[in-house]
UniProtKB/Swiss-Prot annotation:
This is Acyl carrier protein 1, chloroplastic. Carrier of the growing fatty acid chain in fatty acid biosynthesis. One of its GO terms (cellular component) is chloroplast. Pathway: Lipid metabolism; fatty acid biosynthesis. Keywords: Chloroplast, Fatty acid biosynthesis, Fatty acid metabolism, Lipid biosynthesis, Lipid metabolism, Phosphopantetheine, Phosphoprotein, Plastid, Transit peptide. Its main location: plastid. The modification O-(pantetheine 4'-phosphoryl)serine is found at S104. GO terms for molecular function: acyl carrier activity; phosphopantetheine binding. It is found in: Plastid, Chloroplast. 4'-phosphopantetheine is transferred from CoA to a specific serine of apo-ACP by acpS. This modification is essential for activity because fatty acids are bound in thioester linkage to the sulfhydryl of the prosthetic group. Residues 1-59 form a transit peptide. Residues 69-144 form the Carrier domain. It holds the Pfam family PP-binding. The gene is ACL1.1.
Length: 149
């Protein structure tokens, strides 16, 4: 496909779009999944389903950003519950467990709550590296990704 981009660089924008469209169609028809990447962090994946000729288009960067926010929100909820954080006390991604009053036993209980909520297993070494809500969310995202891979 790279040679096609070089060949169409001197055409008008509409000619380039037509040429790329036909190339994309050819690539998609020969593969079950194709991803397009740009420098602007807007990744698009096109997957064909074997049982139908329809295509599934998703914006991966947006999906990942949303998943991280959802993960952080769930971690905040679990931390608030485990530490009995008073209403009105903000718990954000940057919140440190120790600043919220957590001791080592509280941290173990938080990790157990995270394991239950996300259906993951956190090893002891990784659990000791968790100091903030964001640390926990990053570890969860990593473990969930590894589990589904």
């Amino acid at each position: 496909m790279a040679h096609c981009l070089a060949a169409v660089s001197s055409f008008s924008p509409s000619a380039v779009r037509r040429r790329l469209s036909s190339q994309v169609a050819n690539v998609v028809s020969s593969r079950s999944s194709v991803s397009f990447h740009s420098r602007q962090m807007s990744f698009v994946s096109i997957s064909s389903r074997p049982s139908s000729l329809r295509f599934k288009i998703c914006c991966a960067a947006m999906g990942e950003a949303q998943a991280k926010k959802e993960t952080v929100d769930k971690v905040c909820m679990i931390v608030k519950k485990q530490l009995a954080v008073p209403d009105g006390t903000p718990v954000t991604a940057e919140s440190k467990f120790s600043e919220l009053g957590a001791d080592s036993l509280d941290t173990v209980e938080i990790v157990m709550g995270l394991e239950e909520e996300f259906n993951i297993t956190v090893d002891e070494t990784s659990a000791q590296d968790i100091a903030t809500v964001q640390d926990a969310a990053n570890l969860i995202e990593k473990l969930v990704t590894e589990k589904t891979a």
